[in-house]
Amino acid sequence: MGQKINPLGFRLGTTQSHHSLWFAQPKKYCEGLEEDKKIRDCIKNYVQKNIRISSGMEGIARIEIQKRIDLIQVIIYMGFPKLLIEDKPRRVEELQMNVQKELNCVNRKLNIAITRISTPYGHPNILAEFIAGQLKNRVSFRKAMKKAIELTEQANTKGIQVQIAGRIDGKEIARVEWIREGRVPLQTIEAKIDYCSYTVRTIYGVLGIKIWIFVDEE
């Protein structure tokens, strides 16, 4: 059987950079890791609670965390930042308070910045959310995949592969369906590939969505 490695971890240090930048003593490392998870979960939960009502899309491509001794800098890359910025100071302050409460950071300052992405549908996380929304609304999976590929083509990517696994359309037997458009060279380390796996809960059960996007060659 083919051994499938995560395309992001495979390219770390060449075309892929780390999403968390900090140093820690070996004994304290797990605490830092746990802190990162808390920050990411807290932000996602806040965005989910406040935004689901209006559009059903979170639009978070990635969350980068940089830590210094007295400062935690969090950068949220969003495809549709107006969701958080409509009444900007209040929303961001509220989010900051939530994260601070969760972390209980006494002697460290927390700073949250929001960066807009020019082509939201060129990012697999946002695309996976779009497909998940379609599947929840009982749109046929093939239609959802094709629509996602059309959206990606507008974002000037060189190739995309979408895979959906599980009880598709409520069938008794789980199966894997996939579709590819353009080139997706997973073996080439120089090829910048963006990847995400996303779980969606539908009325039929849990489906797994995986998306590979070939951005461009270094």
UniProtKB/Swiss-Prot annotation:
Keyword field contains Plastid: yes
* InterPro entries assigned to the protein according to its UniProt record, in alphabetical order: KH_dom-like_a/b, KH_dom_type_2, KH_sf_prok-type, Ribosomal_S3_C_sf, Ribosomal_uS3_bac-typ, Ribosomal_uS3_C, Ribosomal_uS3_CS
Please provide the record's keywords in A-Z order: Chloroplast, Plastid, Ribonucleoprotein, Ribosomal protein, RNA-binding, rRNA-binding
Q: Which residues form the KH type-2 domain?
A: 47-118
Q: Does the keyword Membrane apply?
A: no
Provide the GO MF annotations for this entry: rRNA binding; structural constituent of ribosome
Q: What are the GO cellular component annotations?
A: chloroplast; cytosolic small ribosomal subunit
Q: Which residues form a coiled coil?
A: none
Q: By its UniProt entry, which Pfam families does this protein fall under?
A: Ribosomal_S3_C
Main location, first listed in the record: plastid
Localization per Swiss-Prot or TrEMBL: Plastid, Chloroplast
Renumbered to this chain, the signal peptide range is none
Name the PROSITE patterns for this protein.
KH_TYPE_2, RIBOSOMAL_S3
**Swiss-Prot/TrEMBL GO biological process terms:** translation
Record-stated family: Belongs to the universal ribosomal protein uS3 family.
Cite the record's note on assembly: Part of the 30S ribosomal subunit.
Q: What is this protein called?
A: Small ribosomal subunit protein uS3c
Q: What is the lineage of its organism?
A: Eukaryota, Viridiplantae, Streptophyta, Embryophyta, Tracheophyta
